A protein has these predicted regions:
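A beta-strand edge to alpha-helix "cap/lid" segment located at domain peripheries
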Residues: 1-26, 30-127
């Protein structure tokens, strides 16, 4: 497992624990999340969901990951399957997730993340 894959594993584990300190340490200052419904959160907004207890992730699996490196930057695309609640409401799902990762002072950190729901493919029908 390379450093980028290890970062992804540590990120998934930290989300499950709600470990704000670990998530803070593994992300750049201007980290941005684009959620599965198109909402955009900056780093503080993203971390506040855990700080306040609004988001509770009971299971997060990050698999089927493919990494492309570009010097001090990388893109990891994988499957993100979660069981979670947000403000007490179920927030389970399976998403295709894109992580943007950059090397800062010799350490890989998450700079951005985008989640897209994985749905069923429906071929077009003839008219």
């Amino acid at each position: 497992m390379n450093e980028i894959q290890q970062l992804g594993r540590r990120w998934a584990e930290a989300e499950q624990r709600g470990d704000v300190a670990a998530l803070d340490a593994m992300t750049v200052g201007n980290f941005t999340l684009v959620g599965p419904l198109g909402f955009v959160l900056d780093k503080d907004q993203w971390l506040d969901r855990y700080r306040t207890g609004q988001l509770v992730t009971s299971s997060l699996v990050w698999d089927d990951v493919h990494v492309r490196e570009y010097g001090d930057a990388a893109v990891a695309i994988g499957r993100h399957t979660q069981q979670a609640t947000y403000r007490g409401q179920p927030s389970d799902g399976q998403f295709r997730a894109t992580h943007v990762i950059v090397k800062v002072n010799g350490q890989w950190q998450l700079a951005g993340m985008q989640l897209s729901p994985i749905g069923q493919f429906r071929p077009p029908t003839a008219s």
